[in-house]
Amino acid sequence: MGEDQRNLFIALGLILVILTGYQMFVMGPAEEERRAEQAAVEASQELADPDLPASALEPAAATTVDRETALGGNQRVTIDAPSVLGSLSLTGARLDDVRLRRHTETIDDDTPVALLNPIGSDHVFYARDGWTSATSGFTDLPGGSTEWTLASGSTLTPDTPITLTYDSPSGLHFERVISVDDNYLFTLTDTVTNNSGQEVELSRYGLVRHEGRPEDETRNMAVFEGALAVIDGAMVRSSFGKLEDGNQTEESGTGGWVGITQRYWMAAAVPDQDRPFTARFRTIERGEIDAFEASYVEQAIAVPAGESLASTTRIFAGAKELGVLQQVQNEVGIERFDMAINWGWLWFLTRPFVWLLTMLEGALGQFGLAILALTLMVKIVMFPLANRAYASMAKMKAVQPKMAEIKERYGADQQKQQQALMELYKTEKINPLAGCLPILPQIPIFFALYQTLFNAIEMRHAPFFGWIRDLSAADPTNIWNLFGLIPYDPTGIWLIGGVLGIGAWPIIMGLTMAAQQALNPPPPDPMQARIFAFLPIVFTFILAPFAAGLVIYWAWNNFLSVLQQYIIMRRHGNETQVDKLVARLLKRDRGD
């Protein structure tokens, strides 16, 4: 089994090296930041919206200004809720100023994360709701440029909803009641009264727009960022890259939602769950910057003259906290809303892992300890399989001298070598595959844990012991400046600085990986031996920029594997490199 297992590890190692190298050196280099500078765009230019009336269009900003200046451009209603603060623009009843109270921009700053930003500022991101009609003469319905009137209320809180009104020249009266819950969900209840004297068909729509790719876009295969939707229970999504390439999506169904998501945050527009709707993703070119849009349009409803229509939709703007998403899904009835989290193709593992991490964090009081506890639990569950693998490795290591003797005896005669080796396996009762097969089920578990930790918002700004203040950021220490003793930052060196950020935890991870390899049977091929000796160094550099929580998990997992493997090998009477090292140290102390 020795060679088979080594080949498996080599293959996995090389695959990981190739994938990580591709991510770092091909996908990683960020494109030059697309600023919201729009001097070339006429102030009167409007954002084309072919399926919506002219009243639904928003004028493009002629220039980019700071966020506070952009917020002062129109009348606003203050939002003050336990989870969000900000304001709502009366122009278009647009939700374009939302900051998240429970999440700060940086670990050293108590400034809330600014999720939604107004037109004219950097990183425009907003959500809104409107109406459209195919009936001739009704082109003045509520849209992006509509000026709503604040009829009642002054500040939007969970206890004090606000009421907006708008009277269209064509004879329709719109009343919109907006409320917000204790988390991130806004409810928009519209009542439309038809005073036009004729029947009119109305369709309600909702949209989320993001101008340009996010400044902090992750561009990692474990993270999905872009437009996504659930339609009839099925997930549909398109990344920012695909949208930028012109990929447009249109799907119809009943029940679901549309949104634009980033690693930790999402803004989503939610139609009436009982109304058929058509969802669409698209990219709208506007000057030097593109607008990415996820939208829906509900099926038209006929409203006779003199009658009214009631309709309720929702907008979610907040953090992708599992408990909040599940609460919205269960209490409000929004279909599969927890799919906003990128569970990956190993969802049947990542879902229980997230649940366990949440439970463990609550019990232990720290997310870092929850990672260690979950890793230990996985090790315990996988112990029977790992025990068989390590036991087989121990037996293989015990017969290494006999295998070397066979290879020396038969030299280049591969056929006789294989026959003699098979006879040896039979005599010693060794199954060459016994150590390889139990390892295979552990591979998806490792990748599922990686996916879980990379997307867990609970890890963001979560501290650990010692110098780790943020588990979602890279280890801040650096070996090249003696871990902060020398006032020098090598990561700023042009071209190579990115690979010089090697902190203490990546080094610990590399040492545990080397220790694990020392317990394995030595490769008979000198080239394989050199590759294995080099892999811990390679992985130390590769994992250096990774989130500290991931590196700590990997180091802890390696340590548990070393401990487990050492105990099993000693039970089989094998002397390990650790034993040899201890023996040499004791011999030196005795002066022998």
From Swiss-Prot:
Could you list this entry's UniProt keywords, alphabetically sorted. Answer: Cell inner membrane, Cell membrane, Chaperone, Membrane, Protein transport, Transmembrane, Transmembrane helix, Transport
GO MF, one annotated term: membrane insertase activity
Q: Where in the cell is it found?
A: Cell inner membrane
Disulfide bonding pattern of the chain = none
Q: Where are the transmembrane segments?
A: 8-28, 363-385, 430-450, 493-513, 531-551
Q: Which GO terms describe its biological process?
A: protein insertion into membrane; protein transport
Q: What is its main location?
A: membrane
Q: Show the GO cellular component annotation of the record.
A: plasma membrane
The record describes its membrane topology as: Multi-pass membrane protein
Leader peptide range in chain numbering: none
Sequence similarity:
Belongs to the OXA1/ALB3/YidC family. Type 1 subfamily.
Known function:
Required for the insertion and/or proper folding and/or complex formation of integral membrane proteins into the membrane. Involved in integration of membrane proteins that insert both dependently and independently of the Sec translocase complex, as well as at least some lipoproteins. Aids folding of multispanning membrane proteins.
Subunit record text? Interacts with the Sec translocase complex via SecD. Specifically interacts with transmembrane segments of nascent integral membrane proteins during membrane integration.
Stated name of the protein: Membrane protein insertase YidC
Q: Which organism is it from?
A: Maricaulis maris (strain MCS10)
Q: What is the lineage of its organism?
A: Bacteria, Pseudomonadati, Pseudomonadota, Alphaproteobacteria, Maricaulales
